[in-house]
Amino acid sequence: DDLYQEVDLDKYQEFMENPAQEMNRTSIDFLQIQAFYQSDVLLQHRWKTLFPDAKFVPEFKLNLLQARQFIPLKGDVLGVVFDDNSADIYLFINGQFKFYNTFEIVSDDDLSYFILNIFDNFGIEGKVNKVLYSAIHADQSFIQKLRTYSNELIEISASKPAVSLDDESEDYNKSYLIDLPTCE
Protein backbone atom coordinates (compact mmCIF):
# COMPACT_ATOMS: atom_id res chain seq x y z
CA ASP A 1 0.00 0.00 0.00
CA ASP A 2 2.93 2.37 0.64
CA LEU A 3 4.12 2.13 -2.96
CA TYR A 4 0.68 2.15 -4.58
CA GLN A 5 -0.35 5.47 -6.10
CA GLU A 6 -3.72 5.93 -7.81
CA VAL A 7 -2.14 8.36 -10.29
CA ASP A 8 0.17 5.58 -11.54
CA LEU A 9 -2.60 3.26 -12.78
CA ASP A 10 -1.56 3.72 -16.42
CA LYS A 11 1.97 2.60 -15.54
CA TYR A 12 0.65 -0.58 -13.90
CA GLN A 13 -1.42 -1.31 -17.01
CA GLU A 14 1.79 -1.64 -19.06
CA PHE A 15 2.80 -4.71 -17.02
CA MET A 16 -0.38 -6.63 -17.74
CA GLU A 17 -0.39 -9.63 -20.08
CA ASN A 18 -2.70 -7.70 -22.41
CA PRO A 19 -2.06 -3.96 -21.89
CA ALA A 20 -5.08 -3.07 -24.04
CA GLN A 21 -7.47 -5.04 -21.80
CA GLU A 22 -8.99 -3.58 -18.66
CA MET A 23 -7.26 -4.58 -15.44
CA ASN A 24 -8.90 -5.29 -12.10
CA ARG A 25 -7.68 -4.36 -8.66
CA THR A 26 -8.21 -6.06 -5.34
CA SER A 27 -6.97 -5.22 -1.88
CA ILE A 28 -5.41 -7.94 0.23
CA ASP A 29 -5.71 -6.36 3.64
CA PHE A 30 -3.65 -8.79 5.72
CA LEU A 31 -0.71 -8.20 3.36
CA GLN A 32 -1.44 -4.48 3.05
CA ILE A 33 -1.13 -4.63 -0.73
CA GLN A 34 -3.10 -3.73 -3.83
CA ALA A 35 -3.04 -6.49 -6.46
CA PHE A 36 -3.75 -5.97 -10.15
CA TYR A 37 -4.90 -8.72 -12.48
CA GLN A 38 -6.78 -9.47 -15.67
CA SER A 39 -9.41 -12.12 -16.20
CA ASP A 40 -11.00 -13.83 -19.17
CA VAL A 41 -13.45 -11.17 -20.41
CA LEU A 42 -15.84 -13.59 -22.11
CA LEU A 43 -15.94 -15.96 -19.16
CA GLN A 44 -16.49 -13.15 -16.67
CA HIS A 45 -19.30 -11.72 -18.83
CA ARG A 46 -20.95 -15.13 -18.91
CA TRP A 47 -20.81 -15.48 -15.13
CA LYS A 48 -22.04 -11.93 -14.56
CA THR A 49 -24.98 -12.64 -16.86
CA LEU A 50 -25.87 -15.76 -14.89
CA PHE A 51 -25.19 -14.23 -11.48
CA PRO A 52 -25.57 -10.44 -11.75
CA ASP A 53 -25.09 -9.79 -8.02
CA ALA A 54 -22.09 -12.09 -7.58
CA LYS A 55 -18.79 -10.75 -6.30
CA PHE A 56 -15.78 -12.21 -8.10
CA VAL A 57 -12.64 -12.97 -6.12
CA PRO A 58 -9.39 -13.76 -7.94
CA GLU A 59 -8.02 -17.21 -7.19
CA PHE A 60 -4.62 -15.84 -6.13
CA LYS A 61 -6.30 -13.94 -3.31
CA LEU A 62 -7.94 -17.13 -2.05
CA ASN A 63 -4.63 -18.99 -2.29
CA LEU A 64 -2.86 -16.37 -0.19
CA LEU A 65 -5.69 -16.26 2.36
CA GLN A 66 -5.52 -20.03 2.82
CA ALA A 67 -1.71 -19.93 3.19
CA ARG A 68 -1.83 -17.16 5.78
CA GLN A 69 -2.04 -19.44 8.82
CA PHE A 70 1.14 -21.27 7.75
CA ILE A 71 3.34 -18.17 7.36
CA PRO A 72 5.66 -17.57 10.34
CA LEU A 73 7.32 -14.25 11.13
CA LYS A 74 10.77 -15.78 10.59
CA GLY A 75 12.00 -17.90 7.73
CA ASP A 76 11.29 -18.46 4.06
CA VAL A 77 8.04 -20.06 2.88
CA LEU A 78 7.47 -21.16 -0.69
CA GLY A 79 3.94 -21.96 -1.82
CA VAL A 80 2.82 -23.86 -4.92
CA VAL A 81 -0.74 -24.34 -6.16
CA PHE A 82 -0.93 -26.93 -8.94
CA ASP A 83 -3.65 -26.71 -11.58
CA ASP A 84 -3.62 -28.82 -14.77
CA ASN A 85 -0.53 -27.62 -16.69
CA SER A 86 0.25 -24.61 -14.55
CA ALA A 87 1.35 -23.73 -11.05
CA ASP A 88 0.93 -20.59 -9.01
CA ILE A 89 4.11 -20.02 -7.02
CA TYR A 90 4.41 -17.55 -4.16
CA LEU A 91 7.07 -16.63 -1.63
CA PHE A 92 7.14 -15.12 1.85
CA ILE A 93 10.38 -14.08 3.54
CA ASN A 94 10.27 -13.39 7.28
CA GLY A 95 6.50 -13.06 7.17
CA GLN A 96 6.56 -10.55 4.32
CA PHE A 97 4.94 -11.28 0.98
CA LYS A 98 7.55 -11.09 -1.79
CA PHE A 99 6.32 -12.83 -4.94
CA TYR A 100 3.36 -14.44 -6.74
CA ASN A 101 3.10 -15.59 -10.35
CA THR A 102 1.60 -18.32 -12.51
CA PHE A 103 3.85 -20.54 -14.61
CA GLU A 104 3.27 -23.22 -17.22
CA ILE A 105 4.48 -26.45 -15.66
CA VAL A 106 4.57 -29.64 -17.72
CA SER A 107 7.34 -31.55 -15.97
CA ASP A 108 9.20 -31.53 -12.67
CA ASP A 109 12.11 -29.95 -14.56
CA ASP A 110 9.86 -26.98 -15.37
CA LEU A 111 8.93 -26.73 -11.71
CA SER A 112 12.61 -26.78 -10.68
CA TYR A 113 13.51 -24.16 -13.26
CA PHE A 114 10.99 -21.63 -11.94
CA ILE A 115 11.65 -22.35 -8.27
CA LEU A 116 15.42 -22.07 -8.68
CA ASN A 117 15.00 -18.78 -10.55
CA ILE A 118 12.89 -17.45 -7.68
CA PHE A 119 15.51 -18.64 -5.18
CA ASP A 120 18.22 -16.91 -7.20
CA ASN A 121 16.27 -13.65 -7.53
CA PHE A 122 15.59 -13.49 -3.79
CA GLY A 123 19.00 -14.71 -2.59
CA ILE A 124 17.77 -18.01 -1.17
CA GLU A 125 20.53 -20.59 -0.91
CA GLY A 126 19.74 -24.26 -0.48
CA LYS A 127 16.32 -24.81 1.03
CA VAL A 128 13.45 -22.76 2.38
CA ASN A 129 12.10 -23.39 5.87
CA LYS A 130 8.74 -24.58 4.60
CA VAL A 131 6.99 -25.50 1.34
CA LEU A 132 3.20 -25.29 1.14
CA TYR A 133 1.33 -26.93 -1.71
CA SER A 134 -2.20 -27.62 -2.79
CA ALA A 135 -3.71 -29.41 -5.74
CA ILE A 136 -6.66 -31.46 -6.82
CA HIS A 137 -4.36 -33.77 -8.79
CA ALA A 138 -0.64 -33.29 -8.19
CA ASP A 139 1.78 -35.50 -10.05
CA GLN A 140 3.87 -37.39 -7.48
CA SER A 141 7.05 -36.32 -9.26
CA PHE A 142 6.10 -32.70 -8.47
CA ILE A 143 5.61 -33.51 -4.79
CA GLN A 144 8.95 -35.36 -4.69
CA LYS A 145 10.63 -32.36 -6.33
CA LEU A 146 9.14 -30.02 -3.70
CA ARG A 147 10.67 -32.21 -0.97
CA THR A 148 14.13 -31.29 -2.28
CA TYR A 149 13.51 -27.61 -1.49
CA SER A 150 12.53 -27.94 2.18
CA ASN A 151 12.57 -30.33 5.10
CA GLU A 152 8.98 -29.32 5.89
CA LEU A 153 6.32 -29.97 3.25
CA ILE A 154 2.71 -29.09 4.09
CA GLU A 155 -0.33 -29.86 1.97
CA ILE A 156 -3.09 -27.28 2.30
CA SER A 157 -6.36 -29.17 2.03
CA ALA A 158 -9.93 -28.88 3.25
CA SER A 159 -10.41 -29.24 6.99
CA LYS A 160 -13.95 -30.53 6.59
CA PRO A 161 -15.35 -32.96 4.03
CA ALA A 162 -17.64 -31.90 1.23
CA VAL A 163 -20.72 -33.74 0.11
CA SER A 164 -20.08 -35.60 -3.12
CA LEU A 165 -22.89 -36.45 -5.50
CA ASP A 166 -20.78 -38.76 -7.64
CA ASP A 167 -17.51 -40.64 -7.55
CA GLU A 168 -15.81 -38.31 -10.04
CA SER A 169 -16.05 -35.34 -7.71
CA GLU A 170 -14.47 -37.26 -4.81
CA ASP A 171 -11.02 -35.82 -5.58
CA TYR A 172 -12.39 -32.29 -5.39
CA ASN A 173 -13.63 -32.86 -1.83
CA LYS A 174 -10.17 -32.29 -0.38
CA SER A 175 -9.69 -28.95 -2.12
CA TYR A 176 -8.94 -26.28 0.46
CA LEU A 177 -11.31 -23.96 -1.42
CA ILE A 178 -14.16 -25.89 0.22
CA ASP A 179 -13.28 -24.21 3.53
CA LEU A 180 -13.96 -20.76 2.12
CA PRO A 181 -17.33 -19.03 2.58
CA THR A 182 -19.89 -19.90 -0.07
CA CYS A 183 -22.64 -17.97 -1.80
CA GLU A 184 -26.23 -18.57 -0.82
Where are these regions (language model features)?
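Active-site neighborhood for divalent-cation/phosphate handling
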Residues: D1-Q69, P161-V163
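Short, surface-exposed amphipathic charged segments that create phosphate/polyanion-binding patches used
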Residues: S27-I28, F70-L73, L165-E184
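Conserved aromatic-histidine-acidic binding/catalytic patches
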Residues: A35, V77, F103
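Structural motif
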Residues: Y37-Q38, V81-D83, L132-A138
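A structural signal for short, well-ordered beta-strand segments and their strand-loop junctions
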Residues: F56-V57, G79, E155
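Gly/Thr-rich phosphate-binding beta-strand-loop-beta motif of the actin/hexokinase/Hsp70
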Residues: F70-Q96
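Short small-residue beta-strand/loop micro-motif enriched in glycine and branched aliphatics
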Residues: F97-N101
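Accessory, usually C-terminal, subdomains that scaffold auxiliary metal cofactors
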Residues: T102-I178
